[in-house]
C-alpha cells in the first residue's frame, strides 16, 4: 500500500466496497461528526487521558500497541483495557493490521571495533533477552521469540501486514 499510494490517481476516493483509505478515514470522520470525540482533539491531555480511559470516561482511542501498557498502569481497571484491530476489511475479505517498527537500534560504523562489539552485545541483549518489545506491547523482534502480549488475543485470524520500504528514489516523497 505505501508503495502504491503515491502512484494512485485518487487514493482517498471511496472504492464503494467498504475498503481502502477512504473508509478508514470515514470511520474517524463519522465519529467526529456524531459528537463521539472530545470537542478539541488537537489539545488532548495525554497524561490525563490515560487515567480517563482506565476509569471509563473515554470509551475508545485509536493508538498503537505501545500505548496499552501505559493505559493499563494509569488506574485500577487494567482488566478493562483491551486492544483490537481497526474495524476495516480488505477486498480479499480478510482483516489485516498494519505493523511497523518503533524505535530502531544502530551501531556507529565510525567508532572503534571494541565499541562496535559492545554495541552489538547491547543490541542482541535488547532484542533477544531483555523482553523489551514484549513489555512495551510490541510484536516479537527476535526470530525465536513468538510470545505476544495477552492483549493481542483479538488479533487471532488477523493478517499482520508490514509496510514495504519506499521505492528507491521516492524515500522523501
Task: Give the residues covered by each predicted segment.
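A structural supersecondary motif
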Residues: 81-91
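Acidic/polar loop patches that form or flank catalytic/metal-binding clefts of enzymes
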Residues: 34-41, 61, 79-83, 132-136
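Short helix-initiation/N-cap motifs at beta->coil->alpha
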Residues: 40-54
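C-terminal lobe and pocket-closing loops
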Residues: 67-77, 90-173
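Alpha-to-beta junction loops
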Residues: 54-63
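Periplasmic solute-binding protein
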Residues: 1-8, 25, 29, 94-109
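Glycine-centered hinge/linker elements that transmit conformational signals in sensory
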Residues: 7-42
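Solvent-exposed, polar/charged alpha-helical surfaces in well-ordered, non-transmembrane soluble domains
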Residues: 22, 26, 30, 51, ...
Amino acid at each position: 500500500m505505501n508503495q502504491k499510494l503515491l502512484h494512485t490517481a485518487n487514493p482517498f476516493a471511496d472504492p464503494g466496497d467498504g475498503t481502502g483509505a477512504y473508509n478508514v478515514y470515514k470511520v474517524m470522520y463519522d465519529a467526529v461528526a456524531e459528537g463521539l470525540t472530545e470537542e478539541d482533539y488537537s489539545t488532548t491531555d495525554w497524561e490525563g487521558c490515560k487515567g480517563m480511559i482506565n476509569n471509563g470516561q473515554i470509551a475508545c482511542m485509536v493508538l498503537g500497541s505501545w500505548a496499552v501498557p501505559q493505559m493499563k498502569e494509569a488506574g485500577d481497571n487494567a482488566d478493562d483495557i483491551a486492544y483490537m484491530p481497526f474495524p476495516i476489511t480488505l477486498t480479499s475479505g480478510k482483516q489485516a493490521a498494519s505493523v511497523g517498527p518503533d524505535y530502531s537500534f544502530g551501531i556507529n560504523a565510525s567508532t572503534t571495533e571494541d565499541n562496535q562489539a559492545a554495541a552489538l552485545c547491547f543490541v542482541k541483549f535488547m532484542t533477544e533477552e531483555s523482553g523489551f518489545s514484549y513489555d512495551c506491547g510490541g510484536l516479537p523482534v527476535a526470530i525465536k521469540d513468538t510470545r505476544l502480549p495477552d492483549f493481542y488475543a483479538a488479533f487471532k485470524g488477523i493478517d499482520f501486514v508490514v509496510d514495504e520500504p519506499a521505492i528507491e528514489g521516492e524515500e522523501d516523497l
